[in-house]
């Protein structure tokens, strides 16, 4: 199986009869893989949360919009994109998360915004997000030591979330994709990769 942990597309919004152009080779390869019997599991991220049924119907992807714990090779694996984890103390992120995941907003957006304008806005918004995290990603190039923005080791929100979750759930591995740079953090039995 292949697991895609979100933000595969810079911005993805599905209208009833329109999908973003520019991803035809990626979509074709994913469809080819699923046609050959390869299971492709796609966990949506904050850049592609508005996935509808197109990728499942046309490309054969298995779509997940929320975290899942799966048993893979005998190990319990927690898989999520990670964009909406550990946001309780961040009211603006919590608000934006609620707005962007709103079915009402999605419906209004699909009926009220022309696809050209929607994609232009989506790419602009995505670019703002990337610029905001670009320096952090560049400074945090170590695979084993996450960039934390502070001198405290291992205080990334996703690592903190994994610590808290593993106190009450038996999980062998946490897999995230939200930070857009590789991580391999181990603390005793806790193992988090990004």
Where are these regions (language model features)?
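Core catalytic region of metal-dependent phosphoesterases/phosphodiesterases
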Residues: 1-72
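Short, charged/polar low-complexity linear motifs in solvent-exposed/disordered segments
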Residues: 29-30, 60, 75, 95-97, ...
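Conserved beta-sheet core of the metallophosphoesterase superfamily
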Residues: 58-66, 76-78, 83, 87-95, ...
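Active-site-proximal loop/helix segment associated with metal-binding centers of metalloenzymes
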Residues: 80-157
């Amino acid at each position: 199986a292949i697991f895609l942990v979100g933000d595969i597309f810079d911005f993805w919004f599905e209208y009833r009869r329109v999908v973003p152009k520019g991803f035809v080779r990626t979509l074709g390869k994913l469809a080819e893989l699923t046609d050959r019997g390869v299971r492709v599991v796609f966990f949506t991220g904050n850049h592609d949360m508005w996935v509808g049924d197109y990728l499942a119907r046309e490309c054969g992807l298995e779509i997940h919009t929320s975290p899942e714990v799966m048993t893979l090779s005998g190990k319990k694996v927690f898989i999520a994109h990670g964009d909406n984890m550990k946001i309780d103390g961040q009211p603006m992120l919590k608000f934006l998360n609620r707005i962007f995941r709103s079915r009402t907003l999605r419906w209004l957006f699909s009926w009220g915004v022309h696809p050209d304008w929607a994609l232009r806005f989506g790419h602009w918004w995505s670019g703002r997000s990337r610029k905001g995290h670009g320096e952090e990603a560049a400074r945090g190039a170590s695979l084993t030591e996450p960039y934390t923005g502070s001198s405290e080791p291992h205080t990334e929100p996703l690592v903190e979330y994994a610590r808290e979750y593993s106190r009450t759930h038996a999980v062998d591995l946490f897999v995230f994709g939200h930070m857009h740079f590789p991580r391999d953090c181990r603390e005793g039995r806790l193992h988090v990769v990004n």
